[in-house]
Structures are given as structure tokens and as C-alpha cells.
Amino acid sequence: MKKQKTSGNQKPKVSYRINEQIRVPEVRVVFPEGGMQVMKTQDARRMAEERGIDLIEVQPNAQPPVCKLENYGKLIYKMDKKDKDLKKKQKTTSLKELRFHPNTDKHDFDFKTAHLEEFLRKGNRVRATIVFLGRSIIYKDKGFELADRLTERLSTVANRDGEPKFEGKKLFVYFEPDKKKIEQFEKQRAMAEKIASLPPLPPDNSGEPEDDE
């Protein structure tokens, strides 16, 4: 059975009462193999000691407090790893934005949509902002039509996140990357590139008459 320790100037990010630090008369114990049971704290501590693990109070405000039978060091390690993985994901995933106008022409639409598609394939969320200048705000329908075109174009790699929303003279449309769609998109793209790289077939002369010798 362990006591909470710190090394040097490091402090644990999460602190739990464990073992002898748990002073309440009874606790609800969650077992590693599943299931739970309310028992006297001293019995729960004894059980933890017999198993060579720790009694960890994870929900002190519950009635009675909830404790887990687990190795304290492993629990902290798992929580730190989960926190690091979350931070890593937050760093690699960012929001990319491109602006459109309700009368955006086809060339500009295709060019910008290709960039949005690239951002999504790299795992980024994207926001398409449709800006209404001057009196063009009276043509809100064009903005929603453009949002639908964007949704259709990006549907091979993403899903639209909610409905388009107006804020002032701007219409915001959000898209979330879809892992499965992206994998399928990449497979189809690789196949198309492979086919395009194949040498052309020789001409079929089977139907032409043979020359007389």
C-alpha cells in the first residue's frame, strides 16, 4: 500500500485520498473485475492490502464515498497520459477559415473549396464564412444556397456541424473531418492516380485485314 509522494518540485496534478488517509466509516468499493459493494473502510483497506494494491477515494462527495481498488501509481499514470493525449490532439487540431461571398464565382468557389477539403483531410475543423457586403444582406437565400453547395462538395471528407448561423452580416458554416470518409477518399484518390499512371493500351488491330504476302 502506498502513500502519495512527490519528487523534487513536482506536484501531482490530481490528488486523491488513499488508504489510511480515508477516514470515513464506510465506503462503496468498485472492484477491478467489475461490480461494487458498500463495506466498512477498514475492511476495504484490508482487502486492498491483501491484493497488493491501493484503496483510492475517487468520489469523496458521494454517500458513501466511492473508492476504487487499484494501483495508485498506475491510476495517476493513466490520467496523465489521457491528459497529454488530449493536449496533443488539441494542438494538432485547429480551426481553419476561408471567406466567401454570396455571389462567389465558380472558379473562386472551386479554388477555396479545394483548400477547405485539404484542411479537413489533415484533420482540421473548418469554418466557411459567407460575408454579405452592403445591401447584399437582403439576399440571404443565396448565402444558404452557397452553404448547401459547400456541404455537398465537402461531404466526401466531412460532416457539417449544425446548421448555418447568421451573426450580423456573416453566415458561418462549420465542418468536422470524418475519419472513415477521409480514408475512403484517400483510397479512391490513390486508385485514380494509379490508373492514370498506367501506360496506354496498344491499338486494337484485330479487326483490320492482314496484308497479302
From Swiss-Prot:
Which segments does the entry list as coiled coil? none
Q: What is the official name of this protein in its record?
A: Translation initiation factor IF-3
**Residue ranges of the TM segments:** none
Name the gene that codes for it.
infC
User: Could you tell me which residues belong to the region Disordered?
Assistant: 193-213
What does this protein do, in the record's words?
Answer: IF-3 binds to the 30S ribosomal subunit and shifts the equilibrium between 70S ribosomes and their 50S and 30S subunits in favor of the free subunits, thus enhancing the availability of 30S subunits on which protein synthesis initiation begins.
Q: Which GO terms describe its molecular function?
A: ribosome binding; translation initiation factor activity
Q: Does the keyword S-adenosyl-L-methionine apply?
A: no
Q: Which PANTHER family match?
A: TRANSLATION INITIATION FACTOR IF-3, TRANSLATION INITIATION FACTOR IF-3, MITOCHONDRIAL
Output one GO BP term: ribosome disassembly
List the GO cellular component terms.
cytoplasm
Carries keyword Amino-acid biosynthesis? no
